[in-house]
Swiss-Prot record:
Keywords: DNA-binding, Metal-binding, Repeat, Zinc, Zinc-finger. This is Zinc finger CCCH domain-containing protein 35. One of its GO terms (molecular function) is zinc ion binding. Residues 183-192 have a biased composition (Polar residues). Pfam families: zf-CCCH, zf-CCCH_AtC3H23. Residues 180-211, 232-258 are annotated as: Disordered. Residues 242-253 have a biased composition (Pro residues). A zinc finger (C3H1-type) spans 117-144, 152-176.
Length: 402
């Protein structure tokens, strides 16, 4: 008797599954049987392959380089002293325009302002095509050297403000970014002697406080002017001043002299000071000679102008009466017929007096002269009258004095 199921035999099911890895269809049998794995599991396994470690390292280095470049663009110290100054370690294997470092043969290369003495002024020869002095030139070569110089970088506001989208901007976008230079660095900003050393601390120039208009020079000049005004009192204006200014007198450049003539400083330029300055320029050869108009006028002053307040004061000074240089003999005849001849008065005593008294008050001088004449005439006539027994007539002397 035949058992159920023994006579029928079903063939095995042939699985034709395409391998997701090789893409080749497998045949029958156990070797051809491949279990289909999900694709997300294969993607997860790929991260552990040895070939992916080098790529990951390159990605990390590139990201770090980009982050460093971004930080470098935002730092003022880096831009002034390192941007296009430090040589790049990667060489030519990347885009130079995206790199903040210097490369061989790059036109944007800068000289280190801490090593080379050059100002922030553009070199005219470099603009024309080339400078023969090279790195020894005292002026800036190129836009980066000019505007990234420590004396010029972010010393002016940007016209676009916070809306500026430049990768490297030379100007300040906010008041906090605006750099204020010390006076010593401001003095040397446009001069080749003003070497940029803001990061390391530039030494102050010994001439920083001696330029025209500095507080020290102005104070010295005001002190000198005050002393000159005090010495220009009415009792000493005709005393001949020294040929050269005193030692405390500060030297003045043409610009400072022009500022003095324009009255740029406080207390200078007023009519009174103009008169004092003109009086300080007096050059009188002899106290007996009348003052000359040319000797009163210093260089650069135009007293001929009718609008000048000092012209009127100078004209009034020139119009004062002058002292006669020689006196003729005086003959006096009394009522009794006696004749008395008086010799010219010795002017040696008058020269010892203050010269300003002779110029300032001619009437007082005449009174003194006639007073002495009257005394001498009185002595002579008294002797003659005593001999003749007649009283002298001195009424004419009183008329002259009055």
């Amino acid at each position: 008797m035949m058992m159920m199921g023994e006579g029928a035999h079903a063939p095995p099911w042939q699985q034709h599954v395409a391998s997701p890895v090789s893409g080749v269809e497998g045949g029958g049998g156990r070797e051809s049987e491949v279990v289909a794995a999900p694709y997300h599991l294969l993607d997860t396994l790929r991260h552990y392959l040895p070939s992916n470690e080098a790529a990951a390292a390159e990605d990390e280095e590139e990201a770090a380089a980009v982050a460093a470049a971004v930080d470098a663009y935002a730092c003022d110290e880096f831009r002034m002293y390192e941007f296009k100054v430090r040589r790049c370690a990667r060489g030519r294997s990347h885009d130079w325009t995206e790199c903040p470092f210097a490369h061989p043969g790059e036109k944007a290369r800068r000289r280190d302002p801490r090593r080379y003495c050059y100002s922030g002024t553009a070199c005219p020869d470099f603009r024309k095509g080339g400078c023969k002095r090279g790195d020894a030139c005292e002026f800036a070569h190129g836009v980066f050297e000019c505007w990234l110089h420590p004396a010029r970088y972010r010393t002016q506001p940007c016209k676009d403000g916070t809306a500026c989208r430049r990768r490297v901007c030379f100007f300040a976008h906010t008041p906090d970014q605006l750099r204020v230079l010390p006076p010593s660095q401001q003095q040397g900003s446009n001069s080749p002697r003003g070497c940029g050393g803001g990061g390391a601390g530039a030494a102050a120039s010994p001439l920083a406080e001696s330029y025209d208009g500095s507080p020290l020079r102005r104070q010295a000049f005001e002190s000198y002017l005050t002393k000159s005004i005090m010495s220009s009192s009415p009792t000493s204006t005709l005393v001949s001043p020294p040929r050269s200014p005193p030692s405390e007198s500060p030297p003045l450049s043409p610009d400072a002299a022009g500022a003095l003539r324009r009255g740029a400083w406080a207390g200078v330029g007023s009519p009174v000071n103009d008169v004092h300055v003109s009086l300080r320029q007096l050059r009188l050869g002899s106290p007996r000679s009348a003052p000359s108009c040319a000797s009163f006028l210093p260089a650069g002053y135009q007293y001929g102008s009718p609008k000048s307040p000092a012209a009127a004061a100078a004209a009034a000074l020139y119009s004062l009466p002058s002292t006669p240089t020689r006196l003729s003999p005086v003959t006096v005849t009394t009522a009794s017929g006696a004749t008395v001849t008086v010799e010219p008065l010795d002017l040696g005593l008058i020269e010892e007096e203050q010269p300003m008294e002779r110029v300032e008050s001619g009437r007082a001088l005449r009174e003194k002269v006639f007073e002495r004449l009257s005394k001498e005439a009185t002595v002579s006539t008294d002797a003659a009258a005593a001999a003749a027994g007649v009283a002298p007539d001195v009424g004419w002397v009183s008329d002259l004095i009055n």
